[in-house]
Amino acid sequence: MFIIELIKGIILGVVEGLTEFAPVSSTGHMILVDDMWLKSSEFLGSQSAFTFKIVIQLGSVFAAAWVFRERFLEILHIGKHKHVEGDNDQQRRSKPRRLNLLHVLVGMVPAGILGLLFDDFIEEHLFSVPTVMIGLFVGAIYMIIADKYSAKVKNPQTVDQISYFQAFVIGISQAVAMWPGFSRSGSTISTGVLMKLNHKAASDFTFIMAVPIMLAASGLSLLKHYQDIQIADIPFYILGFLAAFTVGLIAIKTFLHQINKIKLIPFAIYRIVLVIFIAILYFGFGIGKGI
């Protein structure tokens, strides 16, 4: 049984790594894979299972931090500054770097404030299967609207052309995505595209903005619940973290490489299919009724 439970922990880490930064809602997938299937709370205990999810989320966040490590060093003025994104080498040499620490802070403020004010309310009232399905569906529609709009935009902006106003509006959408199932990246990438950024630029800023706020949120949660960690459960935490980190690295790099080509609609369609699947399990078979 111990080996089977370790495998379950690895599976959850893989799911977290695949979905945390993709616009598909990691919350929706964790409900489907864990709460409806693997049920980590049964072999870890409810409190330890909650802490386990924080740890594997940190694995994904560290993966994003590693992918963007050079950009973070540049934003913090550590190390050598690289060229600015532009259409050609001459543009890159002539433009000063525009993305800076203030952009990131401006984007973090709305979610930070609302998180402090409503975190307990959201955790108590919105973490249910029906509310997550609503978030998945509404988020999918928003992504489709953004993609349809982006097709009309000529010369979309790069991440180094982002303004403080754009950063703030994208930050507001990150706060809206606190609704479970809506998806932080789905919301912020869509908003970035609606603000005339290209898909890659919107994705880059989404990840750069998300890393510090998620590190802070997950770190605080871990400090609150670290006493729930049992020595016997440490192998689950280690393997889950490593799985989330490794798969997260691959998923993030692949996503960033392909997003300008595939856009958001394929992810939106997937989300709608996921809603239908969860609805069948929940309403048709009663699976997850206790969540």
UniProtKB/Swiss-Prot annotation:
Gene Ontology CC annotations of this record: plasma membrane
Keywords: Antibiotic resistance, Cell membrane, Cell shape, Cell wall biogenesis/degradation, Hydrolase, Membrane, Peptidoglycan synthesis, Transmembrane, Transmembrane helix
NCBIfam families on file: PRK00281.1-4 (NF001390), undec_PP_bacA (TIGR00753)
Other remarks in the entry: Bacitracin is thought to be involved in the inhibition of peptidoglycan synthesis by sequestering undecaprenyl diphosphate, thereby reducing the pool of lipid carrier available.
Protein name per its UniProtKB record: Undecaprenyl-diphosphatase
GO molecular function: undecaprenyl-diphosphatase activity
Membrane topology: Multi-pass membrane protein
Species whose genome carries this gene: Staphylococcus aureus (strain COL)
Stated role: Catalyzes the dephosphorylation of undecaprenyl diphosphate (UPP). Confers resistance to bacitracin.
Enzyme Commission code: 3.6.1.27
Group of enzyme by EC: hydrolase
One example of a Gene Ontology biological process annotation: cell wall organization
Annotated family: Belongs to the UppP family.
InterPro entries: UppP
Transmembrane segments: 1-21, 48-68, 102-122, 126-146, 162-182, 203-223, 231-251, 267-287
Main localization, broad class: membrane
Compartments in which it is found: Cell membrane
Gene name as annotated: uppP
Catalytic activity: di-trans,octa-cis-undecaprenyl diphosphate + H2O = di-trans,octa-cis-undecaprenyl phosphate + phosphate + H(+)
